[in-house]
Curated annotation (Swiss-Prot):
Protein name in UniProt: Small ribosomal subunit protein uS4c
Keywords: Chloroplast, Plastid, Ribonucleoprotein, Ribosomal protein, RNA-binding, rRNA-binding
Location (main, coarse): plastid
Taxonomic path: Eukaryota, Viridiplantae, Streptophyta, Embryophyta, Tracheophyta
Residue ranges occupied by any S4 RNA-binding domain in the UniProt entry: 89-150
UniProt organism field: Tragus racemosus
Superkingdom of origin organism: Eukaryota
Gene from which the chain derives: rps4
GO molecular function terms attached to this record: rRNA binding; structural constituent of ribosome
Any GO BP: ribosomal small subunit biogenesis
InterPro entries associated with the record: Ribosomal_uS4, Ribosomal_uS4_bac-type, Ribosomal_uS4_CS, Ribosomal_uS4_N, S4_RNA-bd, S4_RNA-bd_sf
Biological role: One of the primary rRNA binding proteins, it binds directly to 16S rRNA where it nucleates assembly of the body of the 30S subunit. With S5 and S12 plays an important role in translational accuracy.
Amino acid sequence: MSRYRGPRLKKIRRLGALPGLTRKTPKSGSNLKKKFHSGKKEQYRIRLQEKQKLRFHYGLTERQLLRYVHIAGKAKKSTGQVLLQLLEMRLDNIVFRLGMASTIPGARQLVNHRHILVNGRIVDIPSFRCKPRDIITTKDNQRSKRLVQNSIASSDPGKLPKHLTVDTLQYKGLVQKILDRKWVGLKINELLVVEY
C-alpha cells in the first residue's frame, strides 16, 4: 500500500487531530464523526482507528509500521513506548518537531531534496533514525535557508519538546536525549496499535 496523498481533512474528520498531517482543522459545524458513527464501537474498529492515526500522522505505509512494531517487540522495554520512541526519532519527524517544516510530509520533502544535514553530512532518507547528540542543520545555501525560514518564523517555540533544542538564527537543532512518552505530539493509545 502506497503513501496516502488524498484529501487530508477527510482523515482528520474521521480520526481526530493529526498535527503531522496538516495544520488545517475542520469546520466546527461539520462533525461527520457523530453523524455517521453513533452507537457502540467494536474493539476491532477502535484498534484500527488508533493504528490509522499513527500511520497518517507519521506518514508511514502499512509495511513500515509493521517493521517498527516488530523492532519494538524485540526490545526489553514496553513495546508501545519503544514504538513511539522509534517513530519520534525519525529524521522527518525531528525536522517537523524542530519547526523547520509545517507538516511531516513537508519535512519529508526537505529531507528528500537534500536540504538537511545531520552532523555535517547530507542525509536524504526520511526514515533515518536520529540519536542523542545529533545536530540537525540546513544546507549552507540561500535556497535551503529560505525554505526553512518561513516555517521557523510561523512555528510556536512553546510546543518544542524537551528532548530537542533549536537555534533559530543558525537554523540548527540538537537532539538532546530520547523522547519521554508525555512529549509525544499525538493523543494516542499505543497499546491498541500493538494489539492490532
